[in-house]
C-alpha cells in the first residue's frame, strides 16, 4: 500500500460546466481547487444516465452516485428496474402489488398509493404511480392517491403539470386525490419528527387543513410564496379516504433515505425509536424497494446484494477505514457506498456530524463542513482509508439561492485546503470527486432559480503529483483507480477499469 492515509472526498453536487452563468462553482473564490486543477493532473468523469445505471439522459443523484462509486461498476437500481418491468408488463403481475390489492378486497377497505408526484426520477417517477393506478383499477378497485410535492429534483413550481397528468389518468382509471404534502414534511430524513408527523397526521385525517380542489390549493399556496417542496399538508374533507385500520398502502418512492421516517410511523423499524401516537391495525404496508431497517408487510422490488464493494476490499485487506459525513449525507457514505446495505465492516469506524437545525441550508451555507474537517483532522492519522462527504454544493444548490451557493463553495474550498495540508503532513493522498452536478447550474436561460441536479460530468483529481489519469471515465472507475493506487487487487465484480496511468 502507498505510504500514509488515502482519502476520498466526495463533493456532493459539485459538477463541472464551462458556462459561467449561474455557476456557483466557477464564480466562487476557490484558491485551493483552482491551484489543484492548475498544478495536478485530473479528468472529468460521467455521473448521470446510463453511466450510473439510469435511463439515458437522466440526471444523476446522490444515491446512485455513491452506489456506483463504492461498487466500482454500474448497479441497476430502482428507476431502471421498475421501468423495465413496466415495459415488459411484468409489473402487472408483481406479487406484492397484487397482495396489497387482495388485502383491500378481503377487508372491504381502501388501497392507497402515496409518493413523490414528479417526473424527476430521483426518488420516484410519477409514471410508476400512474401504472399502479391502472393496475389497481383493472383489478376492480378505486385507488386513493396521496401526493408529495417535489420542487427539488424538478422546478420549484411544477406540480400543477404533474397533477394535470394525474387527473388525465384518473379520467380513465377512477380514483381520488385525497391529500397533498410537500416533501419537506413527508420526506424528511433528518429526524425532524414534527415534520414527518404533520404529514402522517394529514394522511390519517387527524389534521383539519382542507382543500376542495388540489390544483386550486397549490395555486393558493403559490400566492403565499409556498412552493412545491414546502406545500403545507392538506386533505379533502372526506373521512372515507383517510388511511385507517385494515387498509393497504403502497409507498411508491424507490429511493429509501427520504421514505424511511414516514414508513417507520406506518410499519415500524429497527432504526428509529420515535413513538407513533396513532398506530394502525391490520395495515398492509408495501414499499417499492428495500428501505434499510424498515419492517413493511412486503417489498415490490427487494434489493439485490452488491458484493465486493470498495469498503469490503479494504476491510478484507486488513486495513482500517473511516466514513465521515454530516446527517444529510451520512447514509450515502455508509449505506449507499456499501452497496445499499447497512453493514459494519472489519476495522471500520463511522463518524456522524450533526447537520445544522435550519429550515433550508441557504441560512448556513457552510453547513457542518468545519465540524467535519475538525473531526477528520483529529482522526486522520488513525486510519488507512477515509471516505468523506461534503454536502454543501448539493444541499445549498437545492435551495436555488445563487449567492448562498457561492458562499457554500467558498466554505467548502477552505476546508479542503485544511485537509490537504494535514494529509500531506502524514505523507498521504487525497482523491476528490463528486456524485453528480448541481451547484454549477443555479439559473436557467430566463434567470429563474434552478434547484435540481444536472447531467454534467464531475471532476476526478488527486493532490499527489505521481497520479496521472487515463480518460475518459465515469463514477464506476473511481474505486478501481484508488484500489490500483493502493496496490490492492481489483475484484472481478468491479468491471470498470482503473484510470491510473502507469
Curated annotation (Swiss-Prot):
The Swiss-Prot or TrEMBL record lists the needed cofactor(s) as: Mn(2+)
**Positions bound to Mn(2+) 1:** 394, 398, 453
Q: Which family does the record assign?
A: Belongs to the BPG-independent phosphoglycerate mutase family.
What is the stated purpose of this protein? Catalyzes the interconversion of 2-phosphoglycerate and 3-phosphoglycerate.
Classification via SUPFAM superfamilies: 2,3-Bisphosphoglycerate-independent phosphoglycerate mutase, substrate-binding domain (SSF64158), Alkaline phosphatase-like (SSF53649)
- Keywords, sorted A to Z: Glycolysis, Isomerase, Manganese, Metal-binding
One Pfam family named in its UniProt record: iPGM_N
HAMAP family, from UniProt? GpmI
UniProt-annotated catalytic positions: 62 (phosphoserine intermediate)
Catalyzed reactions: (2R)-2-phosphoglycerate = (2R)-3-phosphoglycerate
InterPro entries recorded:
Alkaline_phosphatase_core_sf, BPG-indep_PGM_N, Metalloenzyme, PGAM_B_sf, Pgm_bpd_ind
Q: Residues that bind Mn(2+) 2, according to the entry?
A: 12, 62, 435-436
Q: Cofactor binding mode, per the note? A: Binds 2 manganese ions per subunit.
UniProt cross-references to Gene3D superfamilies, sorted A to Z: Alkaline Phosphatase, subunit A (3.40.720.10), BPG-independent phosphoglycerate mutase, domain B (3.40.1450.10)
Q: What is its EC number?
A: 5.4.2.12
Q: Name one GO cellular component term.
A: cytosol
What is the protein named?
2,3-bisphosphoglycerate-independent phosphoglycerate mutase
Binding of substrate occurs at: 123, 152-153, 183, 189, 255-258, 329
Q: Which gene name belongs to this protein? A: gpmI
Q: Which domain of life is it from?
A: Bacteria
| UniProt keyword Manganese present | yes
Which GO BP terms sit in this record?
glucose catabolic process; glycolytic process
Amino acid at each position: 500500500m502507498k505510504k500514509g492515509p488515502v482519502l476520498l472526498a466526495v463533493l456532493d453536487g459539485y459538477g463541472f460546466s464551462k458556462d459561467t452563468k449561474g455557476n456557483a462553482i466557477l464564480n466562487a473564490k476557490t484558491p485551493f481547487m483552482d491551484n489543484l486543477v492548475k498544478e495536478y493532473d485530473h479528468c472529468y468523469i460521467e455521473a448521470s444516465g446510463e453511466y450510473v445505471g439510469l435511463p439515458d439522459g437522466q440526471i444523476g443523484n446522490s444515491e446512485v452516485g455513491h452506489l456506483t462509486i463504492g461498487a466500482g461498476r454500474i448497479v441497476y437500481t430502482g428507476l431502471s428496474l421498475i421501468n423495465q418491468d413496466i415495459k415488459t408488463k411484468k409489473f402487472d403481475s408483481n406479487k406484492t402489488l397484487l397482495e396489497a390489492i387482495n388485502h383491500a378486497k378481503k377487508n372491504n377497505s381502501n388501497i392507497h398509493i402515496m409518493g413523490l408526484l414528479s417526473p424527476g426520477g430521483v426518488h420516484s417517477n410519477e409514471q410508476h404511480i400512474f401504472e399502479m393506478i391502472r393496475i389497481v383499477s383493472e383489478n376492480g378497485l378505486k385507488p386513493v392517491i396521496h401526493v408529495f410535492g417535489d420542487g427539488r429534483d424538478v422546478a420549484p413550481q411544477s406540480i400543477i403539470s404533474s397533477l394535470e397528468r394525474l387527473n388525465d389518468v384518473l379520467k380513465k382509471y377512477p380514483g381520488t386525490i385525497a391529500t397533498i404534502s410537500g416533501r419537506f414534511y413527508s420526506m424528511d430524513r433528518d429526524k425532524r419528527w414534527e415534520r414527518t408527523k404533520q404529514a402522517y397526521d394529514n394522511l390519517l385525517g387527524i389534521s383539519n387543513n382542507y382543500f376542495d380542489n388540489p390544483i386550486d390549493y397549490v395555486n393558493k399556496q403559490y400566492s403565499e410564496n409556498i412552493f412545491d417542496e414546502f406545500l403545507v399538508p392538506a386533505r379533502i374533507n372526506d373521512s372515507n379516504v383517510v388511511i385507517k385500520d385494515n387498509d393497504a398502502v403502497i409507498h411508491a418512492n424507490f429511493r429509501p433515505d427520504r421514505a424511511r421516517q414516514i414508513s417507520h410511523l406506518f410499519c415500524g423499524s429497527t432504526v428509529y425509536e420515535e413513538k407513533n401516537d396513532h398506530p394502525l391495525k391490520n395495515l398492509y404496508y408495501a414499499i417499492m424497494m428495500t428501505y434499510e431497517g424498515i419492517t413493511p408487510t412486503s417489498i415490490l422490488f427487494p434489493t439485490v446484494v452488491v458484493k465486493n464493494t470498495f469498503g469490503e476490499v479494504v476491510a478484507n485487506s486488513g486495513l482500517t477505514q473511516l466514513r465521515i459525513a454530516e446527517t444529510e449525507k451520512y447514509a450515502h457514505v455508509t449505506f449507499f457506498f456499501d452497496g445499499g446495505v447497512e453493514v459494519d465492516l472489519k476495522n471500520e469506524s463511522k463518524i456522524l456530524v450533526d447537520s445544522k437545525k435550519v429550515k433550508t441550508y441557504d441560512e448556513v451555507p457552510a453547513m457542518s463542513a468545519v465540524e467535519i474537517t475538525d473531526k477528520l483532522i483529529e482522526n486522520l492519522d488513525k486510519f488507512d482509508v477515509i471516505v468523506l462527504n461534503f454536502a454543501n454544493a448539493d444541499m445549498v444548490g437545492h435551495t436555488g439561492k445563487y449567492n448562498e451557493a457561492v458562499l457554500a463553495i467558498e466554505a467548502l474550498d477552505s476546508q479542503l485546503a485544511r485537509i490537504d495540508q494535514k494529509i500531506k503532513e502524514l505523507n498521504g493522498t487525497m482523491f476528490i470527486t463528486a456524485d453528480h452536478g448541481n451547484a454549477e447550474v443555479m439559473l436557467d436561460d430566463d434567470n429563474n432559480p434552478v434547484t435540481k441536479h444536472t447531467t454534467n460530468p464531475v471532476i476526478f483529481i488527486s493532490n499527489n503529483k505521481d497520479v496521472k489519469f487515463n480518460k475518459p471515465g465515469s463514477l464506476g472507475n473511481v474505486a478501481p483507480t484508488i484500489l490500483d493506487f493502493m496496490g490492492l487487487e481489483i475484484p472481478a465484480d468491479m468491471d470498470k477499469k482503473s484510470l491510473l496511468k502507469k
